[in-house]
């Protein structure tokens, strides 16, 4: 009887271990699948002339918009920009994720920022320095963390040739991701924001923060006259608010659920 009980216990434990291993294997497989889906977009950012052309095009439009913008009497001219994939190129970090099948992790991201190896988005330095030397002021409103990612960010930007990157120009994330409150802080200092530059619709306000893609597309349609004038968009196929807009609670799910949501959102020909 004791032998039977021992064998039963061993069998149960073995089944538990095997189930756990299978779950871990499926999780690792989903992590890998999620990262491999980013490969072509990453190739496009790092290798294509089209990505560079679109970036220059965006900053050329931003310069024209800045030059033509008028501010109210007594106000100072300001431009608000996002940082990641707007001014700074983090595609090597994305490459590390792909090669190691690593989903986004805040600690890994901070290590990347600390490494001070960001690249520059084409046209960003020239636009930044033009604004700061032609009667405007650049403000960097980013969800990099204010507490432990500001120093590495400033060092990187100085290394890359950005001027005007003193501490007071940075409005990084302290507690909340939405940016409208930080825009208001800038305006309270006597500035009028005439141009917003970003790779994510959330860089232009909070109206559609966390919303689904249908609502995000509606926002674009309602504000189409502002794009290329007040709102300047940089290309970024790899991540952003659009990803969370694929499904409700998308970012609360694991890699498997994200893969499912991505595939489920595709519109496809039936072959007939």
Task: Spell out what each predicted region is.
Residues 85, 124-157, 199:
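Substrate-recognition element of Asp-dependent hydrolases with the DxDx(T/V) motif
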Residues 44-55, 110-118, 139-145, 171-173:
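Second-shell loop/turn segments in exported
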Residues 78-81, 88-89, 137-142, 169-171, ...:
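Structural recognition of the beta-strand scaffold that forms the well-ordered cores
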Residues 72-78, 87-119:
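Active-site neighborhood of HAD-like aspartate-dependent phosphohydrolases
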Residues 67, 71, 92-93, 129-137, ...:
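Sec-exported extracytoplasmic/periplasmic mature domains
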Residues 25-32, 150-272:
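C-terminal cap/substrate-recognition subdomain and adjoining C-terminal extension
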Residues 70, 90, 241-244:
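Short, solvent-exposed loop/turn elements at domain surfaces
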Residues 4-7, 14, 19-81, 248-249, ...:
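Non-catalytic pre-domain segments flanking phosphatase-related domains
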């Amino acid at each position: 009887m004791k032998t039977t009980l021992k064998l039963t216990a061993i069998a149960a434990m073995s089944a538990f271990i095997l189930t756990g291993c299978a779950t871990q294997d499926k999780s690792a497989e989903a992590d890998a699948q999620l990262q491999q889906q980013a490969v072509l977009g990453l190739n496009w950012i790092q290798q294509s002339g089209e990505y560079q052309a679109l970036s220059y095009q965006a900053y050329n439009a931003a310069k024209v918009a800045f030059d033509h913008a008028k501010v109210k009497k007594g106000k100072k001219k300001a431009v608000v920009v996002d940082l990641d994939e707007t001014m700074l190129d983090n595609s090597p970090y994305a490459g590390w994720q792909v090669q190691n099948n690593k989903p986004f992790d805040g600690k890994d991201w901070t290590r990347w920022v600390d490494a001070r190896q960001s690249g520059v988005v084409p046209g960003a330095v020239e636009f930044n320095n033009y604004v700061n030397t032609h009667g405007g002021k650049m403000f960097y409103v980013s969800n990099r963390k204010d507490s432990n990612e500001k120093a590495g960010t400033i060092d990187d930007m100085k290394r890359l040739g950005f001027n005007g990157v003193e501490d007071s120009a940075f409005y990084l994330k302290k507690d909340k991701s939405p940016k409208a409150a930080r825009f208001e802080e800038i305006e309270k200092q006597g500035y009028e924001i005439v141009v917003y530059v970003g790779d994510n619709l959330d860089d232009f306000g909070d109206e559609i923060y966390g919303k689904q893609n249908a609502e995000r597309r509606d926002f674009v349609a309602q504000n189409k006259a502002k794009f290329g004038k007040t709102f300047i968009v940089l290309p970024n196929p790899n991540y952003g608010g659009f990803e969370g807009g694929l499904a409700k609670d998308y970012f609360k799910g694991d890699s498997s659920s994200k893969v499912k949501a991505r595939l489920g959102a595709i519109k496809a020909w039936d072959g007939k």
